[in-house]
Amino acid sequence: MVHRGLLRGAPVAAEGELIFTTAATGWGEILTDPSYAGQIVVLTHPMAGSYRIDPAELESTRVHARGLVVSRLVTPPRGPGRSLEELLIEAGVPAIAGVDTRAITLELRRGAARRTVIRDGEQSDRAAVAAARQSPSWDSVDHVASVATLRPFTVPAVGARRIRAVLVDFGVKR
């Protein structure tokens, strides 16, 4: 199935497993959540981007989702933090806006996981579908390796009480 919309975020192509979330807010948290590694996220809520994202509320230090699908992407008022689109551009992650996300969600609920591509309009529908079919399935990729910490690090203590703990990181959230 091909859905046409407006390319937003980073002007690049992306491929991944298409999944959806019904969250009305928390877009920065969703995109930076390690559990979304390798996935293109559909937001079922009809509007995204209405507020600025506080970096302290992100789930990790970088965006793990491969792409974003929204019905309507808006620009928030000026203020501290980044807009949703700024976060996507800085992370090199594309979005597609102006599509019927509820219809896409119903399609997803009826079937198995879908390999998906976000591409610009230069590619034919047939070529886009072929690219999606040829992309690796989500479970054939080691996503833990892409989200796990490569080197030990120390988290600074907060408050007077200090403890020593060890965490094995398979994609830990902040």
Task: Indicate residue ranges for each PLM-predicted region.
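N-terminal beta1-alpha1 cap of cysteine-dependent amidohydrolase-like domains
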Residues: M1-R174
